[in-house]
A protein has these predicted regions:
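Interfaces and regulatory segments of ATP-dependent nucleotide/adenylate/phosphodiester-chemistry enzymes
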Residues: 2-232, 343-479
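Short acidic, S/G/P-rich loop/turn micro-motifs used as interaction or catalytic elements
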Residues: 275-276, 334-337
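A short acidic/basic microdomain associated with nuclease active sites
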Residues: 232-253, 258-261
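Acidic, metal/cofactor-coordinating or nucleic-acid-engaging core segments within structured domains
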Residues: 290-324
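Short secondary-structure boundary/capping segments
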Residues: 283-287, 341-348
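Active-site beta-strand-loop-beta-strand hairpin of nuclease catalytic cores
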Residues: 260-281
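Extended hydrophobic secondary-structure segments that form protein cores and membrane-embedded regions
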Residues: 325-332
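A solvent-exposed, charged loop/short amphipathic helix patch at secondary-structure junctions
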Residues: 276-296
């Protein structure tokens, strides 16, 4: 509703709403929502449910979930000590990508600590003079705007893609979650703030769509999936290792990015650094969904099936493929589609039929899953170890989905129940927070900047800090 305020023309004869007015409005809202979902007459329960939970499930995540998402994005964009995307980001915004991450991280921490408000004086105290006021203002304006700037952004820069799904589409305020006001920054909701900041860098690049970005991001994304797989209880081969097996067996064809091996099975892992489009999350139409998935998730399924088929021919060199097999496609965004069997039956039956005709079924589609990188990192970040960790988890998913009573809609639901099985109830089962927060490069850098700036301002006149805050406010409000 906050978003809609920037799209409607105020009535000159406004008045305080009565109970009857509110009742009428809510009924109209439900009526509109009913018309929107009436077209989702899919025989598939999964496809029918996707639009209904699209703008609901992410709001229910704890704040720590989106804090981890912010840290994950920093790690993806910084495979080394510097970011290969720094220059590209600076050409478009005038600031380095690394600096942007540090500045918005402080803004996120500060607004959470101050009940969604952050005074400009506080920003100056903890970010300046390490960063110039101009750099701070440019960074904040990527995720914030005055009421006028927000209205222009929503109507012109980022117009609504699907007008008839307004009640179920994700709010576009995710792209500008912060309001610039007199004296302070403000956000209507902490979860909106967390997700908006966590996804800000990638959203910027996706909107710009510069040449070669998707390929370079795909490589960085694959590198981070490799980082997540690096656990003592996960053994795996890289793409080059699988190609070597092909060569030794005298075969050629598609390979997966990773092949996790275990004593009694294997997992074909494919990294796809893609995010869903708004329209595919708001529809149950399989054709529209397939159109986007064709070059990402469906392509990943084809790679997994062909790789499993080809390794059958090399089984003398690689015995793990003779046993139980699973497939896992790790995506950047949440597609609200976690089972390969749903894609095979409800979205791309003709493509899968052709695939089966060519290769048979070397891996059951019930054993292929889709998982966002956020959930995958959450899973692999748990401190508790388990023999053949990833195999054990995917078997857990299959067992739960085999029974309608325990079947899950979201991968994170499987993860939570897996943790409860993995660790007794009298022990704490959370992600390894120490690795995610205290030992993270983004966290360390942000703390260092805040400490240096706080030490600089200690003992200085309050009037000096105030003058700087006024200058920052003017820069933020400038058109």
């Amino acid at each position: 509703m906050v978003e809609w305020l920037f799209e409607v023309t105020p009535n000159k004869s406004t008045r305080v709403a009565t109970k009857r007015d509110v009742y009428w409005f809510v009924n109209r809202l439900f009526e509109l929502n009913g018309k929107t979902t009436a077209g989702n007459n899919s025989d598939s329960l999964i496809l029918f449910m996707r639009p209904l939970i699209n703008n609901q499930f992410w709001i229910q995540h704890r704040n720590e979930y989106w804090l981890r998402a912010l840290i994950n994005q920093f790690e993806i964009f910084h495979p080394d000590n510097t970011s290969p995307f720094d220059n590209e980001f600076k050409q478009a915004t005038g600031i380095k990508l690394t600096d942007f991450f540090v500045i918005v991280s402080y803004v996120y921490f500060g607004m959470r600590a101050e009940n969604r408000r952050l005074n400009y004086i506080q920003i100056v105290k903890y970010l300046h003079p390490y960063y110039s006021l101009e750099t701070i203002a440019k960074s904040i304006r990527i995720i914030a705007g005055t009421p006028t700037q927000l209205q222009d952004f929503l109507c012109n820069t980022f117009p609504r893609e699907v007008t008839d799904t307004v009640t179920i589409a994700e709010t576009r305020l995710l792209h500008k979650p912060i309001l610039i006001t007199e004296g302070y920054l403000y956000c209507a909701d902490v979860t909106l703030l967390g997700r908006g900041i966590a996804e800000a860098a990638l959203n910027h690049f996706v909107r710009k769509n510069t040449a070669g970005f998707r390929k370079r991001f795909g490589l960085a994304f694959e590198h981070y999936v490799n980082v997540c797989l690096s656990r003592p209880d996960i053994s795996y081969l890289r793409e080059t290792d699988v190609e070597a097996i092909y060569k030794g067996a005298g075969i050629s064809g598609k390979v997966t990015d990773f092949l996790v091996t275990g004593d009694d099975g294997c997992v074909f892992v494919e990294a796809k650094g893609v995010v869903p489009r708004a329209e595919t999350l708001c529809t149950a139409n399989p054709y529209l969904i397939k159109r986007q998935l064709k070059d990402s998730i469906i392509k990943g399924i084809k790679q997994i099936v062909e790789c499993a088929y080809l390794l059958d021919g090399a089984s003398n060199q690689f015995s793990a493929v003779k046993k139980e097999r699973f497939g896992l496609i790790v995506t950047q965004g949440e597609f609200l589609l976690k089972r390969g069997i749903d894609i095979a039956q409800d979205i791309a039956p003709h493509e899968i039929k052709s695939l089966t005709k060519k290769f048979g079924e070397p891996i059951p589609y019930n054993n292929i899953f889709v998982c966002s990188i956020q959930d995958f990192e959450y899973l692999t970040g748990i401190a508790k170890q388990q023999p053949d960790f990833l195999l054990a988890f995917l078997r857990h998913c299959c067992r739960e989905d085999a029974d309608p009573i325990t079947m899950k809609m979201m991968m994170v639901q499987h993860i939570e129940t897996f943790f409860k099985v993995l660790i007794p109830g009298d022990e704490e089962y959370t992600r390894l927070e120490s690795r995610g927060l205290k030992d993270n490069r983004l966290f360390d850098k942000t703390i260092d900047v805040m400490s240096d700036c706080h030490a600089y301002w200690k003992g200085k006149l309050i009037s000096t800090t105030y003058d700087k805050s006024i200058s920052l406010q003017r820069m933020l409000q400038a058109t």
